[in-house]
Amino acid sequence: ALQKYAKEQTRLGIPFLFHEEALHGLHRRDATIFPQQLTLAGAFEPALCEDMGRMVAAETRAKNIHEVLAPVLDLARDPRWGRTEETYGEDTYLSSKLGAAVVRGLQGEDLATDHTVASELKHYTGYGNPIGGLNCAPTTMGRHDVFSYCMPVFEEAFVKAGATDTMCSYNSIDGFPVVSDHEILTDVLRGTYKMPGFVRSDMTAIIMQHTAHHSAATPKEALQKAVKAGVDVQFADYSHEEYRRLMKEMLADGSITMEELDTSTARVLRVKDMLGLFENPYVDETLESKVVHCKEHQDKALEIAQKTVVLLKNENNMLPLSRSIRKIAVLGPNANLPVMGDYCMEPDYHAVTLLEGIREVLGVPAENVETAANASHPEIVYDKGCNILGAEIKPLERWWFNAKPRPAVGITEIDYGFTAEYFNGADFSGEPVLTRLDSQINFNWIYHAPDDKVDSRQFCVRWTATMCSPKSFEGRIGLSSPDSMRLYIDGELVIDGWGEDKEASQMVPFFFESGRKYDVRVEFRNDARGVRVIFGYDHGEETIDRAIRFAKESDLAIVALGDSTETSGENFDRTTLNLPGKQL
């Protein structure tokens, strides 16, 4: 419908170009999920990467999406960095070969087909070795090292594989933000690598010149520097209204030229032309049911997973397992959890867990978690042991809360949920720009603001409600967010996670008394980009006693530990390389 509107009802009839994340599968709930990039690197087989790219492209184009923000070609030189799993590791040669193979699979021989997409490489460049492993921090590499180790990976993808576009990175190199680096974005990218398409800034990377790097005095100067350097497309830096206003101002005062604006426009139009969108902007609607998560793609995902498993040690020839084993304990927080890796959605189809796979291989009936041994199979016992982070926070349900009345916006005390007041800026001064009813406090605002009225760069939220638990129990109440949050109950500050020096993700003991009304106030400030905002509870501390007992009683214990979406991914950087949370 959107494409039809653009083509048939706008003045110039220029088709839309839709993009999506597709790091190891299209970012859709029904799409095939392939192994994460770091896992792919373990096979050392570019052909597998090309196969994956080809299948991801087919599923993507079948959904009328034309460009993918993939692959990630950063060299991960600091394992504390939360995005390490998105890369092919630290090696320039291996990353070059695997990245180029994915690009060839995605783009094929011709972009203007119903099974190919444009590849937008990221994050150009030097992004994978930030100071302290902190996402978006300046790189520890100097310019010489970036050109020696990082740039050849992108060169291979552009020059040898023909990648179309790129997303420039957040970081600075020797104090100069990449987003305003003319040599990197124009001289090398267009002059040497001959990239045919456009440069997109990473999300808010342009405005970060003003807010983080402090290399631009104003948002306008930040935009001007980016345009001059060779950035063609913004990514949620400015509202459309502000973007147009600033562009007009800069054209009027000579900060940028019409030639520069025309050049950026032509680059975007060129990509649309390469994709064949002017001739055929629509998709064959029968393709989706035939292609997305089809049997061929499922089989290939399984093959890749099997070929990328890495055995670090086989002490005392433990593998293959002896058929004489009669009791197996499957333990750990990841044993019955499908760990898919960052940048994929939770699938709407069933994903087989380690526990389920072991039971299937051994012929244990699927309906039983614990099954006694018999002649045909051993006994399988399972226990989670612990939550990775100790507190498995569950968002509090809306029917536990009655909103605080706001007659002016139609909120009454009989409404379930929270009265939410949104303020632009770093505090709660002035009047809220938006007051609404929020059913829960369970948000992810990294990709979009809560509302068009809210400034995604800096805003605060105050939620108020009366809480009444449907039953009495001893548990814990708390917050989960990398941003600033605090919790008040009956006017008392219960959790203080306000400011960069404090931790908002906390759980505190709390007795939920049935029938008692608690006055609740939760406050939030997006000083870490709003990737996770939760107000919730759990039923108290867990115990590992059962897991220990199972391990002692069994002939073999298979323990699944490690990271999860709670501990690894964008903005989940590490201070230690120990097993996270309570697993040690």
Please tell me what each predicted stretch does:
Residues 1-476, 480-584:
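Glycoside hydrolase catalytic-domain context in secreted enzymes
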